[in-house]
């Protein structure tokens, strides 16, 4: 692996040592990256510290058309790059060949100047691609960092032009591109995998960033339907499979709901949350389309969902000040959405999260959070539904393979072995399992991933202007 120093950045993005627990999440050299992409990460000057990557350029070099999909924040204050990328996708009908990302400045709540700057980034990156006779613009843009400040756009545009000299497809290029996503992250989040569909081998790789201001609630482009509101989460997933634009968007929407929309660090939704997917067909396999080959599409959707889940979990593991990685599973709900809403509420409860930091198996806080979420009306009768407390069970499940610890069974509290409870709570990874006992339907189950609230989280966010 190439030599690199990974830091936790403050409000001025000065270097600080990373925690030792993050070392085993740092990406290792891999040859399983998708074909037909060239990328780089460079220092353009957005961040004050010299040499720290803050600009990433990703190009599809495939001779085949490249489909693109996106899920964006539902925050009312959508940043300029979100609005611009949404417009590019809408005009192109789901085709794009490049992504440009800057870190250190979010270009959010920046008015007309912010929109002009985002479009300037698109046009500068378009210039690195062969001209398209069909599309005016071929680039999607992402930004992350401080809200309410204008981009140093001249530095960024110079960086985009200069990036042409360092574009590559080797591991170092992927690694540098992932580093350029980082703000308060302590390590670059980069993963890749190989998968097969109908005998054809494909590759998928992706990078994301996020450690604070994490509670995404993203939806597909141009179809925002706000639900409850949830530093920014950005992600880009690339594959050399050929996937139709509609199928790529449908698969990404499904995957994001069960991965990035199922994580929380602090319960705050960003203005910039964005996940992009590109499929360039460079592996020369048949087109994956849900209308013509449902089976192949379902395999691809599962691969994408599993991969997105891996990336999303890295964000929680790198949560600002986090000492715990906790899976919250809710089962036996009337619907997936009910289970998801309850798991979300548990995962964002400040009382639950502080108990996790204090290594206190305080299941009363878990129940209180669960019971505060109204269930959706019955899908068959439309009648309101309520949780039956006499059917609810809560169990703590350790990650080390030892015995689970039930603390509530069918509404009746167990005599809890406090020593055993403490053993589980001191683990870095464990699971909170809540069974509502209202349904046996597997669709009534959802998972969420969260972390604890520590003193360090308060210190970081007292120092960092988001």
Curated annotation (Swiss-Prot):
<comment type="pathway">
    <text>Amino-acid biosynthesis; L-arginine biosynthesis; L-ornithine and N-acetyl-L-glutamate from L-glutamate and N(2)-acetyl-L-ornithine (cyclic): step 1/1.</text>
</comment>
<keyword id="KW-0496">Mitochondrion</keyword>
<comment type="pathway">
    <text>Amino-acid biosynthesis; L-arginine biosynthesis; N(2)-acetyl-L-ornithine from L-glutamate: step 1/4.</text>
</comment>
<dbReference type="InterPro" id="IPR002813">
    <property type="entry name" value="Arg_biosynth_ArgJ"/>
</dbReference>
<dbReference type="Pfam" id="PF01960">
    <property type="entry name" value="ArgJ"/>
</dbReference>
<dbReference type="GO" id="GO:0004042">
    <property type="term" value="F:L-glutamate N-acetyltransferase activity"/>
</dbReference>
<protein>
    <recommendedName>
        <fullName>Arginine biosynthesis bifunctional protein ArgJ, mitochondrial</fullName>
        <ecNumber>2.3.1.35</ecNumber>
        <ecNumber>2.3.1.1</ecNumber>
    </recommendedName>
</protein>
<feature type="binding site">
    <location>
        <position position="232"/>
    </location>
    <ligand>
        <name>substrate</name>
    </ligand>
</feature>
<feature type="binding site">
    <location>
        <position position="461"/>
    </location>
    <ligand>
        <name>substrate</name>
    </ligand>
</feature>
<dbReference type="GO" id="GO:0006592">
    <property type="term" value="P:ornithine biosynthetic process"/>
</dbReference>
<comment type="similarity">
    <text>Belongs to the ArgJ family.</text>
</comment>
<feature type="transit peptide" description="Mitochondrion">
    <location>
        <begin position="1"/>
        <end position="9"/>
    </location>
</feature>
<feature type="binding site">
    <location>
        <position position="183"/>
    </location>
    <ligand>
        <name>substrate</name>
    </ligand>
</feature>
<feature type="binding site">
    <location>
        <position position="320"/>
    </location>
    <ligand>
        <name>substrate</name>
    </ligand>
</feature>
<comment type="function">
    <text>Catalyzes two activities which are involved in the cyclic version of arginine biosynthesis: the synthesis of acetylglutamate from glutamate and acetyl-CoA, and of ornithine by transacetylation between acetylornithine and glutamate.</text>
</comment>
<dbReference type="InterPro" id="IPR042195">
    <property type="entry name" value="ArgJ_beta_C"/>
</dbReference>
<dbReference type="GO" id="GO:0004358">
    <property type="term" value="F:glutamate N-acetyltransferase activity"/>
</dbReference>
<feature type="binding site">
    <location>
        <position position="466"/>
    </location>
    <ligand>
        <name>substrate</name>
    </ligand>
</feature>
<keyword id="KW-0028">Amino-acid biosynthesis</keyword>
<keyword id="KW-0068">Autocatalytic cleavage</keyword>
<keyword id="KW-0012">Acyltransferase</keyword>
<dbReference type="InterPro" id="IPR016117">
    <property type="entry name" value="ArgJ-like_dom_sf"/>
</dbReference>
<feature type="site" description="Involved in the stabilization of negative charge on the oxyanion by the formation of the oxyanion hole">
    <location>
        <position position="144"/>
    </location>
</feature>
<feature type="binding site">
    <location>
        <position position="209"/>
    </location>
    <ligand>
        <name>substrate</name>
    </ligand>
</feature>
<dbReference type="GO" id="GO:0006526">
    <property type="term" value="P:L-arginine biosynthetic process"/>
</dbReference>
<feature type="site" description="Involved in the stabilization of negative charge on the oxyanion by the formation of the oxyanion hole">
    <location>
        <position position="145"/>
    </location>
</feature>
<keyword id="KW-0055">Arginine biosynthesis</keyword>
<keyword id="KW-0809">Transit peptide</keyword>
<feature type="active site" description="Nucleophile">
    <location>
        <position position="232"/>
    </location>
</feature>
<keyword id="KW-0511">Multifunctional enzyme</keyword>
<keyword id="KW-0808">Transferase</keyword>
<dbReference type="GO" id="GO:0005759">
    <property type="term" value="C:mitochondrial matrix"/>
</dbReference>
<feature type="site" description="Cleavage; by autolysis">
    <location>
        <begin position="231"/>
        <end position="232"/>
    </location>
</feature>
<comment type="subunit">
    <text>Heterodimer of an alpha and a beta chain.</text>
</comment>
């Amino acid at each position: 692996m190439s030599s690199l120093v990974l830091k936790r950045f403050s409000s001025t993005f000065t270097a600080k040592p990373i925690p030792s627990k993050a070392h085993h999440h740092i990406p290792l050299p891999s040859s399983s990256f998708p074909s037909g992409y060239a990328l780089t990460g460079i220092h353009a000057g957005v961040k004050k510290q010299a040499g720290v990557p803050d600009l990433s350029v990703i190009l599809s070099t495939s001779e085949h058309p490249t489909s693109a999909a996106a899920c964006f924040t539902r925050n009312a204050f959508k940043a300029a790059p979100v609005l611009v990328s949404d417009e590019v996708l809408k005009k192109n009908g789901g085709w794009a060949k490049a992504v440009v990302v800057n870190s250190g400045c979010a270009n959010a709540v920046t008015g007309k100047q912010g929109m002009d700057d985002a479009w300037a980034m698109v046009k500068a990156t378009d210039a690195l691609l062969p001209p398209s006779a069909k599309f005016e613009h071929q680039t999607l843009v992402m930004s992350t960092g401080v809200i309410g400040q204008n981009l140093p756009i001249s530095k960024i545009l110079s960086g985009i032009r200069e990036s042409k000299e360092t574009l590559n497809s080797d591991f170092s290029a992927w690694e540098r591109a992932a580093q350029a996503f980082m703000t308060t992250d302590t390590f670059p989040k980069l993963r890749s995998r190989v998968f097969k569909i109908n005998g054809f081998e494909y590759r998928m790789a992706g990078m994301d960033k996020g450690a604070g201001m994490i509670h995404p609630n993203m939806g597909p482009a141009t179809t925002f339907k706000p639900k409850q509101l949830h530093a920014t989460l950005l992600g880009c997933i690339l594959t050399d499979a050929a996937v139709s634009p509609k199928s790529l968007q449908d698969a990404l929407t499904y995957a994001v709901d069960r991965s990035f929309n199922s994580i929380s660090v602090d319960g705050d939704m960003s203005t910039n949350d964005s996940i992009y997917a590109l499929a360039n067909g460079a592996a020369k396999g048949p087109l994956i389309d849900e209308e013509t080959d449902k089976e192949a599409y379902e395999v691809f959707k599962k691969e994408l969902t599993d991969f997105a889940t891996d990336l999303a979990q890295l964000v929680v593991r790198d949560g600002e000040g986090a000492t715990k990685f906790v899976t919250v599973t809710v089962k036996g709900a009337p619907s997936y959405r009910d289970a998801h809403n309850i798991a979300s509420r548990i995962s964002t409860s400040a009382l639950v999260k502080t108990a996790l930091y204090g290594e206190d198996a305080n299941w009363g806080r878990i129940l209180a959070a669960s019971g505060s979420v109204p269930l959706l009306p019955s899908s068959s009768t439309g009648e309101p539904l309520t949780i039956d407390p006499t059917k609810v069970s809560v169990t703590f499940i350790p990650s080390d393979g030892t015995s689970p610890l039930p603390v509530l069974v069918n509404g009746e509290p167990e005599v809890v072995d406090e020593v055993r409870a403490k053993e589980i709570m001191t683990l870095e990874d464990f699971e909170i399992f809540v069974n509502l006992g209202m349904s046996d339907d597997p669709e009534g189950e959802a998972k969420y991933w969260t972390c604890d609230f520590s003193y360090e989280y308060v210190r970081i966010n007292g120092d960092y202007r988001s």
